[in-house]
Structure formats: C-alpha cells, structure tokens
Amino acid sequence: MKMRRYKLFLMFCMAGLCLISFLHFFKTLSYVTFPRELASLSPNLISSFFWNNAPVTPQASPEPGDPDLLRTPLYSHSPLLQPLSPSKATEELHRVDFVLPEDTTEYFVRTKAGGVCFKPGTRMLEKPSPGRTEEKTKVAEGSSVRGPARRPMRHVLSARERLGGRGTRRKWVECVCLPGWHGPSCGVPTVVQYSNLPTKERLVPREVPRRVINAININHEFDLLDVRFHELGDVVDAFVVCESNFTAYGEPRPLKFREMLTNGTFEYIRHKVLYVFLDHFPPGGRQDGWIADDYLRTFLTQDGVSRLRNLRPDDVFIIDDADEIPARDGVLFLKLYDGWTEPFAFHMRKSLYGFFWKQPGTLEVVSGCTIDMLQAVYGLDGIRLRRRQYYTMPNFRQYENRTGHILVQWSLGSPLHFAGWHCSWCFTPEGIYFKLVSAQNGDFPRWGDYEDKRDLNYIRSLIRTGGWFDGTQQEYPPADPSEHMYAPKYLLKNYDQFRYLLENPYREPKSTVEGGRRNQGSDGRSSAVRGKLDTTEG
C-alpha cells in the first residue's frame, strides 16, 4: 500500500515537472517564428510546380463598360529591373548623418498668476473688451516656459477668474481648456485622457521638448507617406525612411523614393528626412518571408539611429509600417510631457482599400519608446520593440534600476478614441496589384501567386464590395465621411487629389446618388465633409 502511494506521488511529481517544462518550452516558442518556418516549407516547394512567377504588368480581363482607372501612379511601370545602386549625383544620400535640431517652438505660456498653459489647448482672450485695461497684455507681462525670451502674448483666461463688484479680476493658476484638451495645463489630448496610462496624475510639462524620430519602411505607399509628412511634419523632428532595391519577395525594384527626394517631390519636408538604403536581400528571406520582414525593420533602426547626431536618451522613437499614421496630438503630447511610461502603442482606426471601408475594432501595435530604452532593452532593434514583450528582454530590470522608471506598457487612445489611422491595401487597383506581387513569402496564402487574384477587374470588385481575396464579404456598412477621425485632415483638405481614398470609386448606392449630388458643392465634396472641414479649420 505504501509502495503504491509512493509511486502515485512520484507520478504526480513527474507530471508537474513535465507541465512546468512544457510551459517554459511554449513560452520560448512564442518568441520564435517556429510556426512560420514550418508554414514556409511546403507552399514554396509545391507552388513552383503549379504557378509561374507573376507577370510584371497588371493584367485585366476585357469587359464592356469597364470603369476607367483612377490614376497611373509612379509604381505602375515595370519594377523588375536590375538592382539599382545610388547614382553618382546622390551616392552619398544614404551615408549622410542627420543632426537633430533643438525644438525652439514656444508651446506653453505663463499666466501672471504663475500658471503654465499649453497655447493650442487653452482658451485665450484675443481682443480685450473696451474699458478693461487689466486684460491687455504687454510684452513684459508674459514669458515663455522655455527661456527668458519675451514675446507679446495673448491673455490666458484662468479657470477661476471672476469679475468682482467693481470690475476687478481675481487671478488663479488654472487654465481654461478648449474642447479636446485636458489637464491643469490643457496640454493632455483626448487620446491620452481616455487611454489606459496609469500615471496621468504625474504628467508635467517639460522645460525642453523631446525630439521625435519616426522610422518607416517604404515600398510604394507614396500617397500615404505624403499624408504622414503633412500630419506629423511639425511635431516629428526626423523621418527615418528606409528604401530597398528589392521587394519583400526578393525581386529587384527601382528606388522611386530616392528619385522623388532628389527631383523635388518632397522638397517641403526634405530637411527632416534621413534616407536609409538597404542594398541587399537577407539570406533565407525568399524561403521564409518573415526573415525579410523582420530584417527590414532591424536594418532601418540600426542604420538610421547610428546616423543621428545630437541624440538624447529621452528622445522618442516611433517605428511604423507605411500604412500606419499616428495622430498629431498624441505624438505632440509625447514630445512635451514627462510622466508617461514606456513602451507605448497607438489605437488606430482600421480601414481597408480606403477610409470608406471601416473595419471593427482598432489596430494596437507597440511602436514607440525612448531612445534609451530602445538601446538598453531592445538592443537597437525595431522589430523587437514591435513584437517582443519588454519583460522578456534580458536587460529590462537593469534599465528600470538605472533610470528609476517602472516599465508599464500602455496605449494612446482606446477602442472608442482613435489615436491614428491604419489604412490597409489603400491603393488604386494598380497599386494593389503591385502589393500582391511584392508581398513577402510568409503571410499565407500569398494571393499574388494566383493569377485570378491579380486581375484588375477582380481587384476593382473587391474595392467595390469591401470583400477579401478568400471570397468573404464585408459585413459592415461603409463609413460616414463626417465622423470624427474619418481620415487625416490633409486628405480632407485635398479631397479631389485623394478622392480614391475617401470615396469608394466603384460603388454608388442608387438611393443616394441624386441626393448626394444635390448636397455637393462646386469642389465635389459632400456637405457633411465641408461642414467637418469648416469645424476643424475654425
């Protein structure tokens, strides 16, 4: 009897040890692309027998009454050229260092009572009423938070300023916040106020703004890149943009972004762009596309950060996909405030083919931290920042002990308050075709391997219905252009130029066609969109 109990006890102990070992093994596997490696073996071996490589030129089956193509973008020409190295005229473009400037913008002002108020978020009295000389502001009455330089400033209304019996005002410290801004200084945007940040009560304005570095890999998302530059151009201090002469699939491609930088297309933002050139394709990337996908971000981070000069440990690093655009207010908050934790993510509005097909939920991907954490915890590797939990990294405890900051991951925005936009497959039909044939060999099924999926008429039908390549159909209605955070402001202000992203070009509901035409102005915008623009601009 005792022997049986002893054996039973040993069996339970062995089962417990096996369970613990399995859990450790499973935890280790969760950080290795093991399923992807398995998935990448069979499809490639078999597909080469059944499918030829995709043709370079988009193929469209002829159909009567076929709608005209919206645009002929730069990338519609054949990308399968010999690998291109930088020309002599711009051969140093990918070797030049970038000196980060100091941000001298005066974001905050002080009230005469000693309060610190964020200018864009505070209600100010621009035109004093007659007979109230106490509301007039002189140069010597206000000073910037950032330094001794004194400038004429508008009078900052305080939350507790009240008229006394004889017309005198009592001065208090608080600021009166405009809609969308919160906190004692009116510098906390809604996407932070309604986020899961656990240290909101510790937020304080900085004396010196951080510099913000935004890193992106680019293939042919030039319209979305233009939108990013206009959305974030005044708050981001350096855009680190990586371009390769190979697609994610390993095929040669021309360096179109480098060409656009040198021919003046992006002249308005050229002074803030650090160009990174990846001139090789990683070994094994053709067999396992995730190797190539990860390597692009690793190279982008390491080469880009190594060429940044005047970099400080508390500067902010944000790495995005080209179709992920953070909202300006959230990025500006990270620049101007102390007290938030790291790493951080953005809740982004999800859409497909254009902003008109809104998808449920949000995209929430960890994409930012300080330069200090990027170097000390993630080993200067952007893909680790996006895909690895910080507490699995070996040096995170040392970083906490050295800095005195407890690492807590949080996200700007919420499922109800978007902090950016993720516009997936947002191209013209030709652009979607190019994305199909350029896609990595790891995100299966790889739809670019199927000839019928590359047909332009089929692609147009997907845009019209919101369907997917596997035959599933959209189960949610088109988005309303008048809704908050429908699209970045630059898109709405240039409606005609980006109409293919804002309106479904292949679908016109019969019941609303005439009514929509009656509500459109001379610029082609609907009354709802015009009203929204008037509100935002006012």
Swiss-Prot record:
Ranges of the Lumenal topological domain: 24-538
Q: What is its main location?
A: Golgi
Glycan-linked positions: 245, 263, 401
Where is the protein found, in the record's own terms? Golgi apparatus membrane
- Which superkingdom does the taxonomy of this entry point to? Eukaryota
Task: Name the UniProt key words of this record, in alphabetical order.
Answer: Glycoprotein, Glycosyltransferase, Golgi apparatus, Membrane, Signal-anchor, Transferase, Transmembrane, Transmembrane helix
What are this entry's molecular-function GO terms? beta-1,4-mannosylglycoprotein 4-beta-N-acetylglucosaminyltransferase activity; glycosyltransferase activity
Q: Which residues are listed as membrane-spanning? A: 8-23
Location of the region described as Disordered in the Swiss-Prot/TrEMBL record: 121-151, 509-538
User: Residues on the Cytoplasmic side?
Assistant: 1-7
Pathway(s) where this gene product acts: Protein modification; protein glycosylation
Q: Name one Pfam family in it.
A: Glyco_transf_17
Q: Which reaction does it catalyse?
A: N(4)-{beta-D-GlcNAc-(1->2)-alpha-D-Man-(1->3)-[beta-D-GlcNAc-(1->2)-alpha-D-Man-(1->6)]-beta-D-Man-(1->4)-beta-D-GlcNAc-(1->4)-beta-D-GlcNAc}-L-asparaginyl-[protein] + UDP-N-acetyl-alpha-D-glucosamine = N(4)-{beta-D-GlcNAc-(1->2)-alpha-D-Man-(1->3)-[beta-D-GlcNAc-(1->4)]-[beta-D-GlcNAc-(1->2)-alpha-D-Man-(1->6)]-beta-D-Man-(1->4)-beta-D-GlcNAc-(1->4)-beta-D-GlcNAc}-L-asparaginyl-[protein] + UDP + H(+)
> What's this protein's family per the entry?
Belongs to the glycosyltransferase 17 family.
Job description of the protein: It is involved in the regulation of the biosynthesis and biological function of glycoprotein oligosaccharides. Catalyzes the addition of N-acetylglucosamine in beta 1-4 linkage to the beta-linked mannose of the trimannosyl core of N-linked sugar chains, called bisecting N-acetylglucosamine (GlcNAc). It is one of the most important enzymes involved in the regulation of the biosynthesis of glycoprotein oligosaccharides. The addition of this bisecting GlcNAc residue alters not only the composition, but also the conformation of the N-glycan.
Q: Quote the protein name from its UniProt record.
A: Beta-1,4-mannosyl-glycoprotein 4-beta-N-acetylglucosaminyltransferase
| Species of provenance | Rattus norvegicus
Name of encoding gene:
Mgat3
